[in-house]
């Protein structure tokens, strides 16, 4: 039907004592589905109940289509759910900076942050840091033009398939 949803019974059944983390893509890649606040809350509650850490990959968050509401996991109203998560973001998708190898993560729980810092080894690409700074500082106008352009590409593909290959279904990413 072109709509993506979670099979909640299967989801919870997979949370065994051997499950320690959930990698949550929001927006989901490759479907483009944007999880609702209600779904994110349910995911967060189930992960808390089963002592599963949420690793929220939100690197595609800038590509949400007009009219679609994207809810960052770290913005959920339950502090315990948010504290049980680490969010990953970056500009590699938004500004085509994948070669810069630069991204970042954050979490709100000081104990978890200290644990990550103690066990995580990282190094920064100095050119990547400069590229990210430039994108954040000067990229808004370019990006404001990109979203309508991408949206028109979705419409172009949808119209083409409808006309030339009507038996092929197409669902626009959210």
Model-identified regions with their sequence ranges:
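Alpha-helical elements of Rossmann-like donor-binding domains used by nucleotide-donor carbohydrate transfer enzymes
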Residues: 10, 14, 18, 42, ...
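Hydrophobic residues in well-ordered beta-strands that form the structural core
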Residues: 23-24, 54-56
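Active-site pre-lysine segment of PLP-dependent enzymes
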Residues: 4-18, 30-53, 60-97
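PLP-dependent aminotransferase class I/II
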Residues: 84-163, 167-173
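Substrate-binding/gating loop at the entrance of the active-site cleft, primarily
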Residues: 1
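Short acidic, glycine-rich surface-loop motifs adjacent to enzyme active sites
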Residues: 22-23, 29
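Short, well-ordered beta-to-alpha junction loops that form the rim of enzyme active sites
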Residues: 27, 58-59, 173-174
């Amino acid at each position: 039907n072109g709509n993506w949803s979670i099979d909640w019974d299967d989801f919870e059944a997979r949370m065994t004592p051997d499950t320690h983390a959930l990698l949550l893509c929001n927006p989901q890649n490759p479907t483009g589905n944007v999880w609702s606040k209600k779904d994110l809350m349910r995911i967060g509650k189930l992960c808390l109940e089963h002592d599963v850490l949420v690793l929220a990959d939100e690197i595609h968050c800038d590509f949400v289509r007009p009219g679609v509401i994207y809810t960052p996991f770290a913005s959920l109203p339950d502090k315990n759910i948010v504290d049980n998560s680490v969010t990953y973001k970056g500009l590699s998708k938004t500004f085509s900076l994948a070669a810069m190898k630069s991204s970042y993560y954050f979490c709100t729980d000081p104990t978890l942050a200290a644990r990550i810092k103690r066990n995580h080894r990282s190094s920064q690409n100095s050119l990547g840091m400069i590229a990210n700074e430039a994108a954040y500082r000067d990229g808004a106008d370019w990006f404001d033009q990109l979203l309508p352009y991408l949206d028109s590409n979705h419409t172009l593909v949808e119209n083409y398939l409808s006309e030339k290959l009507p038996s092929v279904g197409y669902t626009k990413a959210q």
